[in-house]
Design a protein with these regions (language model features):
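Oxidoreductase cofactor-interface core, primarily capturing Rossmann-like NAD(P)-dependent enzymes
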Residues: 136-229, 234-236
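N-terminal Rossmann NAD(P)H-binding glycine-rich loop of SDR-like oxidoreductase domains
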Residues: 5-25
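Amphipathic terminal alpha-helices
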Residues: 299-339
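Conserved Rossmann-fold NAD(P)-dependent oxidoreductase catalytic core, especially the SDR/UDP-sugar
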Residues: 103-148, 166
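Non-catalytic, hydrophobic alpha-helical segments
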Residues: 14, 77, 214, 218, ...
């Protein structure tokens, strides 16, 4: 008999790839989704796999009982619902992220356990990993988003009784899907890169991965992940300079990427934050502190850790450049869109 997986957020970017891989590996797959405003084509019949039963439920407002009923009969659950750190909500940011990342997620996990789900995976952030291995940075104290990610993992493991819980901590992710525009365009590329002959950015490095390997991590966590474990997932460590130059190169544009002193990057970040505050917004990350303490250094998941996690969860490697190309082509499909 086929094992059955319920994916919360199956029409989202990461959930969609996880669902497709689960089908390919012979699982019976179902999805619970919110048809949010970011979904370009809400007619699922034209692009979403017909083998996947999709139910539209707002997991943030739904009752625990409603969610339990929806997950009855499933062996596994993958929770692929954001928001991530790139979303800037109305202040206070902590309340926004806590409700969505902690309260609502914990509700879904309780419902899954009541429904008889044996093992569940949550998509978390590599900021939680950095908070764990670099306590001197005090990331969860300074950034509401990081605090909520740490609280999410802690609560899911504290409240469980018989259901196994595996936490995946994700880095920068590249790739594309037909019915969504990559969030890269609105929150990053159009703001800081597109239309600028010279791009000023921070001198540090980060960890990156192609979305196909995120799907492998999700299924690998169900098949091989240890209960209670937190796995930092990634493929390659690259500098921001390389990333910006390669993204531009993908659209045939050569840009100068200059690395100004950190204090100048901090001033730029403070200007962005002032703009947010005037609109009553607050980021989940303190951008000035991120520029000063995170993006100005090579804050990466160590290669030996990446190797160990990829081996344990059976995650493939490579394809980063191709995934960046797909991202850029989806963001800017027409000649001249990216300058």
């Amino acid at each position: 008999m086929k094992k059955k997986i319920m994916i919360i957020g199956g029409t989202g970017f990461l959930g969609y790839y996880s669902a497709k891989l689960a089908l390919k590996k012979g699982y019976e797959v179902a999805s619970i989704s919110v048809l949010d405003d970011d979904l370009v084509n809400k007619d699922l019949s034209t692009w979403f796999p017909k083998e996947i039963k999709n139910t539209i439920i707002d997991v943030f407002s739904a009752s625990e009982e409603e969610l339990t009923k929806a997950m009855k009969g499933y062996d596994y659950m993958i929770y692929s619902v954001g928001p991530d750190d790139r979303y800037t909500p109305k202040a206070p940011a902590y309340e926004f992220f806590h409700f969505r990342l902690v309260d609502s997620c914990a509700k879904c996990f309780r419902a899954a356990e009541k429904a008889g789900v044996k093992k569940a995976v949550v998509f978390n952030s590599y900021f939680a990993y950095f908070d764990r291995v670099h306590p001197e940075l005090k990331l969860q104290e300074k950034h509401p988003y990081v605090r909520c990610r740490v609280e999410q993992a802690r609560l899911l493991n504290e409240q469980k009784k018989n259901m196994e819980v595996v936490v995946l901590e994700f880095p920068y992710i590249f790739g594309s899907m037909e019915s969504r525009l990559p969030i890269w365009r609105d929150v990053f590329l159009d703001r800081y890169v597109n239309g600028h002959k010279t791009v000023f950015f921070s001198k540090g490095s980060t960890t990156m991965i192609a979305v196909e390997h995120i799907a492998e991590a999700a299924i690998g966590a169900l098949e091989y992940g240890k209960d209670g474990e937190r796995y930092p997932v990634g493929d390659q460590n690259k500098s921001y300079k390389w990333m910006l130059e390669y993204m531009s190169q993908c659209k045939g544009v050569k840009k100068k990427v200059k690395l100004p002193p950190t204090w100048l990057c901090v001033l730029g970040a403070k200007a962005i934050e002032r703009g947010f505050h005037k609109q009553g917004l607050e980021g989940g990350l303190d951008y000035a502190l991120v520029m000063k303490e995170v993006m100005s250094i090579d804050l990466v998941v160590e290669p030996e850790v990446l190797d160990k996690v990829c081996e344990e969860l059976h995650i493939g490697r490579g394809g980063l450049e191709e995934a960046i190309q797909k991202t850029m082509d989806r963001c800017y499909p027409n000649p001249g869109d990216f300058k």
